[in-house]
Regions:
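Aromatic-acidic/polar surface patches that form glycan- and anion
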Residues: 9, 42, 62, 66
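Glycine-rich FAD pyrophosphate-binding loop
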Residues: 21-43
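Flexible, glycine-rich phosphate/dinucleotide-binding loops
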Residues: 13, 35-36, 58
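N-terminal Rossmann-like FAD-binding beta1-loop-alpha1 element of flavoenzymes
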Residues: 2-29
Length: 113
């Protein structure tokens, strides 16, 4: 099997490396930042997965892809060794009083059907 180099060890780079490694490829990850990933987008958002929270400002297909991805995380994490801190507890949407018309149960219900 050939060796594959992946430039960028953020979330996507790591997931691609994992997938290729499981297919038998030898993979090397390169990244300009620290190994801890403290400069990555996922670190900045604390790994927050909130497709419903993005619903006000994103096209419906983006929100639907977010829900599909959210369903995959427990399956992926179950295949990894070591500790992970994944909790799926729901979404709390907080808004200013003047925004209450935008954040109604009717708006969010269309994504939950």
């Amino acid at each position: 099997m050939p060796t594959i180099a992946i430039i960028g060890a953020g979330l996507m780079g790591r997931l691609i490396a994992l997938s290729l490694n499981r297919q038998g490829y030898q993979v090397t990850l390169f990244d300009k930042d620290q190994k801890s990933g403290q400069q990555s987008a996922a670190y900045a958002a604390a790994g927050l997965l909130t497709p419903l929270g993005e619903a006000m400002h994103s096209p419906r297909n983006i929100v639907e892809m977010g829900f599909a991805a959210l369903a995959l995380w427990p399956k992926l994490l179950a295949t990894l060794s070591g500790y992970n801190f994944f909790q799926q507890t729901g979404t709390l949407v907080v808004s200013h009083e003047q925004d209450i018309v935008d954040y109604t149960a009717q708006f969010f219900q269309k994504y939950l059907e």
